């Protein structure tokens, strides 16, 4: 059940990463063959967001505008569009504004990739097979995410990047199932699109 499409056994780490590269929510232990959107759809985080338990309905006015939007998570095209979860527009027949939105969303998603690169380069155990039970492997990954956050709190980004030549230039980046989406989710994405188009 942990056998993935790359033909090896794995568990999945699905996370929420803040703009300062910290892991603020992690879900570990899903089967390696499951899709990201499927894992997210059955996660406790998704359940809480659907209920509004994590203040997903709080709104903020975007800088230098009168556009008010809720706080959102950023996902790739495999995730569903939700009022609290932005995904790119499908890649066919995009307007210039939609292309701009997709580029800005992709740029925001790079923070997650950077955080993964940082922990993989600092804790090399993540770059190879961990020969323990899936439960213990999940605990190892949890502790690594926790240690990563502690180091960021105590030493800052320079300590993280100082020991990692492959993590890329993380300082210049920022964050942040069925693909049917609600009218509210589409409205939120349209607001971000309009804002990005007018604030390059």
Task: Pin down the residues of each PLM region.
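Short, polybasic Lys/Arg-rich linear motifs in disordered N-terminal/cytosolic regions
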Residues: 1-200
